[in-house]
Amino acid sequence: MKKKTTLSEEDQALFRQLMAGTRKIKQDTIVHRPQRKKVSEVPVKRLIQEQVDASHYFSDEFQPLLNADGPVKYVRPGVDHFEAKKLRRGDYSPELFLDLHGLTQLQAKQELGALIAACRREHVFCACVMHGHGKHILKQQTPLWLAQHPHVMAFHQAPKEYGGDAALLVLIEVEEWLPPELP
């Protein structure tokens, strides 16, 4: 490993002289994620109750109106449509992943409820739900269930690196979280 070379006093003075009158460039391209709060240990009964409460919103009878053309996407009324575009482009990277492969519809609903509850509890605003291709049952039902939940702000078909058309990126409403503002 190379040793660091130190500049002589003369070189340092020359550098300061050349840099006089310059100003620091404002960083405007990378949006930093807000710091997540540390989560304390949660009792098992509370976790089960959160899961039941969150899955209460999912109904098989209600069919929300989703766009049938192109990739699967949804934006809750009152949420900026640009959020779905950011999901599509991969500007948000998911912090929690849920794999629904091999689950029944009832199990999948419970796991979705648990994921949303965990996201809100741990202040995670982007998650990835992998429903897979399979017999297209979960692939069709998952967006319908997510669109019914009041804490789901938006979702979009995941980019290739997160599963492509076999997965969804979901934006979850967290109380303190606001989308980062670009300057």
Swiss-Prot record:
Organism per entry: Escherichia coli O157:H7
Pfam name, any one: Smr
Coiled coil spans: none
Keyword terms: Endonuclease, Hydrolase, Nuclease, RNA-binding, rRNA-binding
SUPFAM superfamilies associated with the record: SMR domain-like
Gene3D superfamilies xrefs: 3.30.1370.110
PANTHER family assigned: DNA ENDONUCLEASE SMRA-RELATED, UPF0115 PROTEIN YFCN
Identification of the protein by name: Ribosome rescue factor SmrB
Subunit structure as annotated in this protein's UniProt entry: Associates with collided ribosomes, but not with correctly translating polysomes.
NCBIfam families with a match to the protein in the record: PRK04946.1
Example GO molecular function: rRNA binding
Keyword set includes Transmembrane: no
Function: Acts as a ribosome collision sensor. Detects stalled/collided disomes (pairs of ribosomes where the leading ribosome is stalled and a second ribosome has collided with it) and endonucleolytically cleaves mRNA at the 5' boundary of the stalled ribosome. Stalled/collided disomes form a new interface (primarily via the 30S subunits) that binds SmrB. Cleaved mRNA becomes available for tmRNA ligation, leading to ribosomal subunit dissociation and rescue of stalled ribosomes.
GO biological process, one term: rescue of stalled ribosome
EC number: 3.1.-.-
Positions of the Smr domain: 98-173
Family classification: Belongs to the SmrB family.
